[in-house]
């Protein structure tokens, strides 16, 4: 686990690509710059999709735990 301050949590357990990334985009759109979203997922595609989403949308992937499910991703909203 990590001690990163979380502003919001998004549970995407049971959802499959592209739903986790679509919900991530929708959720982070309503957050303030600098806030942190914790995404909880079990879709193996998220291991590549979340980092690609962050890079493409200029958000920062602060940390990820992908060794076991559920996967966890800490995303800091960019501009």
Swiss-Prot record:
It is found in: Cytoplasm. InterPro entries: Sulphur_carrier_TusA, TusA-like, TusA-like_sf. It comes from Actinobacillus pleuropneumoniae serotype 5b (strain L20). Belongs to the sulfur carrier protein TusA family. The active site is at residue 17. Coiled coil: none annotated. The keyword rRNA-binding does not apply. One of its GO terms (biological process) is tRNA wobble position uridine thiolation. GO terms for cellular component: cytoplasm. The gene is tusA. Sulfur carrier protein which probably makes part of a sulfur-relay system. Keywords: Cytoplasm. This is Sulfur carrier protein TusA. Disulfide bonds: none annotated. Pfam families: TusA. GO terms for molecular function: sulfur carrier activity. PANTHER family: SULFUR CARRIER PROTEIN TUSA (PTHR33279:SF2), SULFUR CARRIER PROTEIN YEDF-RELATED (PTHR33279). Its main location: cytoplasm. It comes from the Bacteria.
């Amino acid at each position: 686990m990590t001690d990163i301050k979380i502003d919001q949590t998004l549970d995407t357990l049971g959802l499959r690509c592209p739903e986790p990334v679509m919900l991530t985009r929708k959720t982070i759109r309503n957050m303030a710059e600098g806030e942190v979203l914790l995404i909880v997922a079990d879709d193996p595609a998220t291991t590549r999709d979340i980092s690609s989403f962050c890079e493409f949308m200029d958000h920062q992937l602060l940390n990820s735990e992908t060794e076991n499910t559920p996967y966890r991703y800490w995303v800091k909203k960019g501009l």
